[in-house]
Amino acid sequence: MRGLRPALSTFLFLLLITGGVYPLLTTALGQWWFPWQANGSLIREGDTVRGSALIGQNFTGNGYFHGRPSATAEMPYNPQASGGSNLAVSNPELDKQIAARVAALRAANPDASTNVPVELVTASASGLDNNITPQAAAWQIPRVAKARNLSVEQLTQLIAKYSQQPLVKYIGQPVVNIVELNLALDRLDE
């Protein structure tokens, strides 16, 4: 019985620290130092939430830049079903999916002169990626320019404006947030 009291005291102390103090402290510090990120990096226009800067959306029209394909089942870009397709590189089903995506992109982008960028036909590990390279966005310019009656130069400048450089120059590559880019396109129409 004597050994039970110190064990129970230690258990209750650690329960209080790890189950109460630590979560409350990290939540408070996150809200204080990084309020936008701690609340989901939501993109707002007025009182309306238009999306999150962290999760891709299913932009399908010709007047929008398209992101990476979603690997989530049933509903594209469903954050509650995050996860990759888990298809191995040697799986014939993956080859079929990529071939179908390439054919669809070629049909939607007949004026594109180079090969389809790889990130437009392969899903990310989370299945929710919202970023593509500026080169993949530029590949789609002829289709978007035609659908929105905008010049190639206007769209090139917009891509440059919404391109984000890596924190460390030699680690990573520049990316374009598709959600922010497409919302900027919608604002041009207003």
UniProtKB/Swiss-Prot annotation:
InterPro entries, per database record: KdpC (IPR003820)
An annotated GO cellular component of this protein is: plasma membrane
- Membrane topology category: Single-pass membrane protein
Q: Which domain of life is it from?
A: Bacteria
Where would you find the membrane-spanning parts of this chain?
A: 10-30
Q: Which UniProt keywords apply?
A: ATP-binding, Cell inner membrane, Cell membrane, Ion transport, Membrane, Nucleotide-binding, Potassium, Potassium transport, Transmembrane, Transmembrane helix, Transport
Intrachain S-S bonds? none
Q: What compartments host this protein? A: Cell inner membrane
Primary location group: membrane
The GO terms describing molecular function are:
ATP binding; P-type potassium transmembrane transporter activity
Q: Which family does it belong to?
A: Belongs to the KdpC family.
The cross-references to NCBIfam families, in alphabetical order and at most eight, read: kdpC (TIGR00681), PRK00315.1 (NF001454)
Q: How does it assemble?
A: The system is composed of three essential subunits: KdpA, KdpB and KdpC.
Q: What does this protein do?
A: Part of the high-affinity ATP-driven potassium transport (or Kdp) system, which catalyzes the hydrolysis of ATP coupled with the electrogenic transport of potassium into the cytoplasm. This subunit acts as a catalytic chaperone that increases the ATP-binding affinity of the ATP-hydrolyzing subunit KdpB by the formation of a transient KdpB/KdpC/ATP ternary complex.
Q: Which PANTHER family match?
A: POTASSIUM-TRANSPORTING ATPASE C CHAIN, POTASSIUM-TRANSPORTING ATPASE KDPC SUBUNIT
Protein's UniProt name: Potassium-transporting ATPase KdpC subunit
Source organism per entry reads Escherichia coli O45:K1 (strain S88 / ExPEC)
